């Protein structure tokens, strides 16, 4: 019996000793974690700890023996420090002023609640009251030790990117730095810019290409392959809402180069349109494609090299830097030198009246293959800004406040070809190849693919083209 009691007592004492060691070692574990983020402090002596200035124990109070509640924020290391006697060991986790205050003062102030400085913290950094920082498209102000942020819907939204990339939609989304910090409203206001088509434009009779109905259309076609060096890549409209000007100038330049069989291959100037298309001109605040084509026919454009894009789009308010006059024989000539004085050629390029191509998929393909790229007026929604690669189709936001996150607006692009791919399930997926005007860092080197034959985003609803206005001396 006595032997059993001794075993029981021994087991109890062993357990108590083990628990005490575990308890005492906990601060050691915390200490290791505490100093992992600041290795210089871990290796340092008491002298190194002294380089941090501030009142910690002096504000918080000192504690006898061990007191794990005797702790306060150590802001310089973005961690915690202690003001009890237990902290003063070989690897000290004491606050910087422990030795100068707790050891020297004979009477310690009473133990108080942790002291926190005025202001706010963000990612370990301290900000004073009234500081303002940006969180994507929202401004946050430090007020009463809390961040108070505006509640705008941002153009770049991580949850929408994640939704697209996790879903089986056939395309992938990306966070673009040029869109970061913009609200959804700003994106639609500054990155599109084509006004809805006028009734006159929509009432135009559709024309069909002269290719025979039995023409065998290839599965894959790209205009730049058929006419190398005669078509033009995407430019970047930046925050100038003028897709109406960029798409019109690009389609016209391609058509003139193809029609002249490579004699005139200059890209035409969208800035010329933005600054000079005077009647009802909105410039970088949107415009109409019918007015753009009117200007090309009546006044003409110079090359992009002659009239390049302004770095500061507010400069468009200074008016038109180019003018032309008729020679009485159907041609117009510039009356001013190029705004870019390095470029000497100020030749004026003109087009015939625009015509509407049939919305039939096959007819659009025939037109592109026979005469060159065409202009398409599409409807852009919020997910399109995130497009990186694949065959685009609109993905509806699953956000609970979905209406707040949805917008729809007109945009003008250039269709340059088409193709077909096998989908994940083995089915055929047809697509158009289109050039956007958001620079080559967006999408597939400035281009995008979009579902073909189903009028995705109204891409096939309104197709516009034109002929170059060439005199007999211009033609090859």
Curated annotation (Swiss-Prot):
Native source organism of the sequence: Homo sapiens (Human)
SUPFAM superfamilies: Cysteine proteinases
UniProt keyword list: Basement membrane, Cell adhesion, Disulfide bond, Extracellular matrix, Glycoprotein, Secreted
This protein's name: Tubulointerstitial nephritis antigen
Gene this protein is translated from: TINAG
Glycoprotein keyword on record: yes
Record's keyword annotation contains Heme: no
Lineage: Eukaryota, Metazoa, Chordata, Craniata, Vertebrata
Cited function: Mediates adhesion of proximal tubule epithelial cells via integrins alpha3-beta1 and alphaV-beta3. This is a non catalytic peptidase C1 family protein.
Database matches in InterPro entries: Papain-like_cys_pep_sf, Pept_asp_AS, Peptidase_C1A, Peptidase_C1A_C, Somatomedin_B_dom
Family named by the database record: Belongs to the peptidase C1 family.
